[in-house]
Amino acid sequence: MPQPASDTLSPRTRLALGVLALLLFFGGLGSYPLLEPDEGRYAEIPREMLARGDFVTPRLNGVLYFEKPPLYYWLNAAALSLPGRPEVLCRLFSALFGLGGVGLAWLLGRSIGGPRVGLTAAIVLGSSPLWAALSRANIIDMALAFFLGAALTCFWLAQEKERGERGERLLWYGMFAAAALATLTKGLIGFLIPGAVIFLYLLFARRWRLLSRVPWIGGTALFLAIAVPWHVLAAQRNPDFLWFYFVHEHWLRYTTSEAKRQAPAWFFVGILAVGLIPWSGVLPAAARLYRRGQGRLRDRPGLIFLACWALFLLLFFSASQSKLVPYILPGIPPLAVLAALALQEAETDPRTRSWVRVGGAIGALLLAILAAALLLVALGKIHTGVSPLPNVLVFAMPALAAGLLSVWLWGSGRLRSLAAL
């Protein structure tokens, strides 16, 4: 694991980054109404929980609503019990999870590539339009992305420690707890996705011995203690819960077109290409990390882990018969770390530097075009026929501004200087 020469930022730099992050994720959260259908739905369900005093059975307009587990509803109910505008309160936890995901990218990048990669990964993720924009929306998927990211980051940090080293056991338990919270957020994928990613990593990195270090009994007990009680209570109070929740909402939604959310197999590739602008232009350069490391790839397990994470998420959701844009959010953090590694590699490898320059220039151009188009829509110069779009712009534009700022910082060398602090 790379050891940094210095792992501190100046107080001025920390303050500037903190202010920028707060503005990006929390600025103007209440300046636009809740968007239908999702934001309104995920505000009404917790409101009804508070009104009825029933936190086991979710209801929407009085009708049972078991499409999702209740953790995000509970969090929103807690937020709505505070004084303030409902628009702000309902988006508060999503913004916190989005910012928390940036922190996880920093931890993961720092562990794999050092402090410069960690800081760059955090900047890449935080300034990616899709991540920043959906952090400002009242949707469940950002919470899921955070908990899945926390589970996988805890796994990585735990396996990087020596057996018995201080903090190792806490990280293993953190992995189980985060997977349980992900399960309470959006169902079985909360543990299936981390389990699949970890299995693939152990397979390709040939690190099966890690399994002997996992506290399976205590970890499983912790997972069950967090994830199971609500499922038991919901089944006891609602006879049709088990079939609807496990069969209809998990199996049938994934394997059939019943939800009427079909899209082409390449749908999420396109979403990532646009949603990570300008950094999606840098990702092809990340492929050179694997080509250059062919002979020593087993000595760079971080690359294997990031590839297993990103590719499995992409393939898993691409195979689903139900596709929506936010589903791919959990696959963005490893791509941010890969982009940061590519940017670092570009400083020493001329060919990687050429790839980064060309891809970055294309990404910056596309970002500028996208920002200009959205601005014209907001000003009424372009008519889309989609009435909510001007409201979407309110939280999309800060993300685009962050992306443009990051491009300017990188192009001028200021981002590299910042990451070196």
Placement of each model-derived feature along the sequence:
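Loop-to-helix entry region of an early transmembrane alpha helix in multi-pass inner-membrane enzymes
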Residues: P70, W74, L82-G100, N138
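Transmembrane-helix motifs of polytopic, lipid-linked glycan transferases
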Residues: L92-I112, A150
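Perimembrane helix-loop-helix junctions
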Residues: P4, C154-R166, L170, G190-L224, ...
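Start-transfer (signal-anchor) and selected internal transmembrane alpha helices
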Residues: M1-L24, A221
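Membrane-embedded architecture of ER/inner-membrane glycosylation machinery
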Residues: P2-A5, R169, Y173, L289-L421
